[in-house]
Amino acid sequence: MNWKERIGRWHLSRTIAVSRVPRGCSLRNAQSVGLLYLERDHEFYRTIKGIAKHLRDELGVKNVSMLSFVNEDMKNTPGWLVRKLGGGFFCKSDLNWYGRPINEVQQFIESDFDILIDLELEPVLALKYILKSSNAKMKVGPEQLDFPLDYDINIGISPVAKSVGNDVDKNDDMSIWKEQTERTFQFITEANIQ
């Protein structure tokens, strides 16, 4: 961990979470869902779009917003990404010097999502700032030891992911991500959350 990341984590730990009253909701009853994720490649982007389509078409969620962080400067962002109202993406050039997003994400933060889902297994500081600042009624994400209080519902990491640890290649990493994401969506769809 470099010094900028340490300072960013320190600032994040001192950032006061937005005052809100958490309210549970299952995906079957949700009207609006926000998805936070780290952009990887075009195939991953299509996977996320497929998740959003499933939420709309299969579960009847009326408003699905996706927000990704691209770990590049604006001039190097992939061509398939589009900035749009209430979603889209932000990149390194949209962060201040210690990693906090500025400007571009404000409308997403202010959206009153029924459920905000962090799709990242490992903490991404830029996304953590958005998560902490969000007005979402319920925040869901994977168990992260460094950030145990960030979510209203923590979905435990699968035993396979824990046993594999850091010795994974990109394909194994994606299969672990897919398994965790499926577990997350299965839980918040089937659980009687009220």
Question: How does the language model describe each region?
Answer:
Residues 1-32, 42:
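Short N-terminal or domain-adjacent regulatory/targeting segments
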Residues 41-60:
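Histidine-anchored nucleotide/phosphate-binding helix
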Residues 56-107:
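Conserved nucleotide-cofactor-binding alpha/beta core module
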Residues 57-59, 109-110, 131-135:
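Short, conserved loop/helix-junction motifs that constitute active-site signature segments
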Residues 120-134:
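An aromatic- and histidine-rich active-site surface loop
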Residues 146-194:
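Active-site-proximal region of nucleotide-activated glycan assembly enzymes
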